[in-house]
Design a protein with these regions (language model features):
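Feature captures the catalytic ectodomains and active-site-proximal regions of enzymes
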Residues: 1-422
Length: 422
């Protein structure tokens, strides 16, 4: 069954952009729903019962398949091609839901692991200013801007726990109820600084390939009788969409590679009292990388508007080419806002940050004071088909034809699927 009713819940913002949903049909509520299914606790808003056919199941095990970037538009375009996705549509329920804002993996994996929206945990983007460090870093990589290896910030003495403003994890809460959490993570990040914080309380099983991960998951599921959440994440569809752009032959081939392997390996699973959940954090938007508008080059008079942190580092723009967060020197805020609103009219929505917060774009209040310090002063939201960013040689620029983070339907409307047998 395809449950399209939530599509009517999305309200317009401006220029074809949509407002995110947090109260019900939202990625923000997946973690609460998992906890509810396994413990009966209600910590906050849940995904509505119609996402499960009208009644919440009471499984002993919940298996989640987090397929990065495989949002609603891609599920619609490719869902009929593969055994598993067809089964979820025909025998389970597939529901369009809202991504978070920003529609990013950094925000989403933090929300899934902690059970709170970005307004509470404060880790909203890949490029993000952390006042405790005095500079903008790449959050999940835990590295400074520029070309650095993963966890380079550890060598600078930074505490990765300070990236998040909430520290109790879903895994720790489940453990108090006697529910095991097992996360299947790629070796490239399984032991990373970020993952060590976000996955606290979970058992982490490492893999190098998709087939290895799916065999590990199937064997764990069939051999372990205890109550458990088994969580799987896969990034490659998102990676290829970034490099070549969504909707390209490369993207379609990666989608086929993932689901064909899934169909071949993860089938005839012997695990009663289990529910399988499929979801994505967002979709993607295409634009030609060469058409990226660089703010500091389009408007040279704005090149000196960035403030310095207390440690003397420039506070470079946060976010990405679909959601730009500008920290601006106080005396320049009015003229920078006016320049962007006038010079990019018809291309972007430009908002003072307090207005974005007042509209609840980051989730329900109260808003973490730490988030407010990180966000800066001006938010730039490009319309569909546009990338806007900042270029600083050796520090930042745009190399991709696919991005997400903003509020266009193709990136904001994502998907949640549920089925009780595979």
């Amino acid at each position: 069954m395809i449950n399209e009713a939530p599509l009517a819940r999305f309200a317009p913002l401006a220029g074809g952009l949509l407002k995110p949903i947090y109260s019900d049909y939202s990625f923000a509520n997946i973690a609460n729903t998992i906890e509810h299914l396994l413990t009966d606790d209600v910590r906050g808003p849940l995904l509505p019962a119609d996402c499960f056919g009208g009644v919440y199941p009471r499984p002993r095990k919940v298996v989640t398949f987090f397929v990065d970037s495989f949002g609603w538009a891609f599920w619609k375009a490719h869902g009929d091609r593969f055994r598993t996705t067809r089964a979820v549509m025909e025998k389970g329920v597939v529901t369009p839901i809202s991504a978070l804002f920003p529609s990013t993996t950094a925000a989403s994996v933090s929300t899934l692991n902690l059970g709170v929206p970005p307004s509470a945990h404060a880790l909203y983007e890949w490029n993000i200013y952390i006042p405790a460090y005095g500079e903008v870093i790449q959050s999940l990589a835990f590295a400074p801007l520029g070309r650095h290896g993963q966890d380079a910030c550890v060598k600078k003495g930074y505490d990765p726990a300070k990236m998040l403003d909430v520290h109790e994890t879903v895994h720790q809460r489940l453990a108090r109820h006697g529910v095991r959490s097992v996360q299947f993570s790629n070796r490239s990040y399984a032991g990373s600084a970020y993952n060590s914080v976000a996955s606290a309380g979970a058992d982490v099983i490492r893999h190098g390939t998709l087939s290895e991960a799916l065999v590990q998951l199937k064997e764990t599921l069939e051999q372990d009788a205890e109550k458990a959440w088994l969580g799987f994440y896969w990034a490659s569809i998102d990676t290829i969409a970034h490099i070549h752009g969504p909707g390209t032959p490369f993207h379609a081939a990666e989608i086929a590679s993932f689901w064909s392997t899934f169909d071949a390996v993860f089938r005839d699973v012997d695990s009663p009292d289990t529910v399988y959940l499929f979801f994505a954090d967002h979709g993607q938007v295409y634009a030609d990388v060469h058409d990226t508008i660089y703010i500091n080059e389009r408007f040279p008079e704005l090149a000196d508007c960035l403030p310095l942190s207390p440690t003397g580092h420039p506070i470079y723009p946060n976010g990405a080419p679909r959601d730009v967060f500008l920290h601006v020197r106080p005396e320049r805020r009015d003229d920078v806002l006016a320049t962007l609103q006038q010079g990019l009219d018809g291309i972007v929505l430009v908002l003072p940050m307090h207005e974005a917060l007042n509209q609840g774009l980051f989730g329900p209040g109260p808003v973490s004071p730490e988030l407010r310090r990180r966000l800066g002063d001006i938010l730039i939201l490009p319309f569909q088909g546009h990338f806007v960013w900042w270029r600083e040689r050796g520090v930042m620029g745009n190399m991709f034809n696919g991005h997400h983070g903003g509020l266009a339907p193709d990136e904001l409307v994502t998907v949640f699927g549920a089925i009780d047998a595979l």
